[in-house]
Amino acid sequence: MLAGIGFYRRFISPLIGPRCRFTPTCSAYGLEAIQRHGPWKGGWLTVKRLLRCHPFTPCGCDPVPD
């Protein structure tokens, strides 16, 4: 999972530019969530975050929960 996020950050993100509506960015959120909560819970938190990141959601701070 972490390698997938790293690949996205290194190769895909520079091509499409900044698009995340939240702070921290979705990729940073994913890294932190997986590091803090492990691959299952952290991965699930990341998927939920990605589903919230769309033009109809207000922008703002959305930290990884404890």
Swiss-Prot record:
It is a peripheral membrane protein. Keywords: Cell inner membrane, Cell membrane, Membrane. Could be involved in insertion of integral membrane proteins into the membrane. This is Putative membrane protein insertion efficiency factor. It is found in: Cell inner membrane. It comes from Parasynechococcus marenigrum (strain WH8102). Belongs to the UPF0161 family. One of its GO terms (cellular component) is plasma membrane. NCBIfam families: membrane protein insertion efficiency factor YidD. InterPro entries: Membr_insert_effic_factor_YidD. Pfam families: YidD.
